[in-house]
Amino acid sequence: MKYLISTFQRILKILLPNDLKEFPKFSKKDIKRFQTWDNQLGWCNLPNNVKLDRSDRKFQYQKNPTGIAVISTDEKGSRKCSYPSEKSEISFYGDSYCMCRDVQDNETIPWYLGEMRGTRVSNYGVGNYGLDQALLRLIRDYQYERSEIVILSVVSITISRCCSVYRHYLEPGNFFAIKPRFKITENKNEIKLIRYPFQNKEEITNLKKFKNFFRSNDEHYQLWKKNKLNYYFHILPRKILKKFGISLTQNSTETLKYDLSFWQKQEVLFLEMMSQFQSFAEKNNFKPIFLLQHQKKSLEYLKNKSPNELEWTAVIDKPKKRFPKITFLDEAEIFNKYDNIDELYLRSHHSPKANLMISEFINKNL
C-alpha cells in the first residue's frame, strides 16, 4: 500500500509539479528559511554573514571538495572587499554578476579593482536583482556608505526582471522572489513605484490573497499561462522520452529573446531609471557609471550580431546623449572577440579571469 501511495505521489508530481501551480501553499517553517527577506526590496543580503554559494552546495558532501565558493558580507552588508577599513572610493550595486557568484571573496570585480586602486571598493550586488531593485537599494542605503563613484552593474536580461513583481511568472518555481517595480503611467509622462506588497514575511503563506496585485502589475503573467500549456505539450513528453534514454535538443534562445525584447518594449522605463540615477548622483555629488554585463548565453548571442542588431543598443544610445554625466560601459567590448568563451565562466557566472579583465576595463574608464 505504501508503495502504491508513493508511486501515485511521484506521478502526481510529474503531472502537476509545483512550478505549474500559481500559488502553492507554504508553511511557516518554509517562510522561516527565507532569511534574506526585506520589507522594501523583497530580499537583500544580510550583514556579517557567511554562506556557501547555492550553486556549489551539491559539492559540499564530496570527500575532497574543490572550487566551493564562500560568500562573506561585512557589517555594512557589502561582500568582503580589499582594504575593508578604508573609506569607500567606489561602490557597486546590482545583481549576482555584480556580486560575482561562483568565485571566492578575493576573486570578485570589486576586490580586484580595490587592489588596483589601493582603496575600498564595496560590493552591494544581490542575486536575482533587477536594475530597479539595485537603484532602489542605492537610493535607500547610499547614506550609510558614501563613495565618489557608484557603478550600477546588471546583466542584459535586467529589463524583463524590472517588469516583474512575482518572479514565478517569469522563472517558474521562484516563488519567494516578490519585489517592487517601477511602472510608467499611461500618459508616459512620469514613473511611479509599485511598492512591495507585504508588511511582514508571514503574509507569503497566503500568496493567493494578492492574486490581483500580481496579475495586474506583472508583465509576465501571460507568459506563465503559456508555459503551463507548454509543459504538457513539450516538456512532459521530453521528460517521458528521457526516461527511455531519448534526449531531444531544445531551442534555448527563445527564452533569451523574450527577455531581451523588453529593452524596446520598456525603453521609457529604462530612460526614467537613468534619469533617477543621474539626479541622485548630482544630489550626492558622485560619478555615476552604468555597466552592462552578460550571461554566457547573452555573450554567445551577441557574438553573431552587429551592435545595431542587439536589442539594447539603440535603447542605451538615447540616455548616453540625454544623460552625459553617466558613463555607459558594456563588458562585451572586451569579450566579443574573445575566442574561448568557456574560460570566462564558472558554472553560471564569470570566472576569476573574466572578473579580473572586467576590473581592468573599468579601471581604464574611470
Task: State each model region's role.
Residues 4-112, 116, 227, 256, ...:
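Membrane/wall-proximal cationic-aromatic binding patches
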Residues 125-127, 292-293, 330-333:
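Residue-level recognition of beta-strand->loop/alpha-helix junctions
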Residues 99-186, 193:
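Conserved SGNH/GDSL esterase-like catalytic core that processes O-acyl groups on lipids
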Residues 297-366:
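Catalytic His-Asp segment of secreted/periplasmic serine-dependent ester chemistry enzymes
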Residues 3-12, 16, 157-317, 334-339:
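Serine-dependent acyl-ester chemistry module
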Residues 118-120, 146-150, 282-288, 324-326:
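Loop/turn elements at helix/coil->beta-strand transitions in domains of secreted/extracellular proteins
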Residues 131, 135, 267, 271, ...:
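Short, amphipathic alpha-helical "lid/cap" segments that border enzyme active or binding sites
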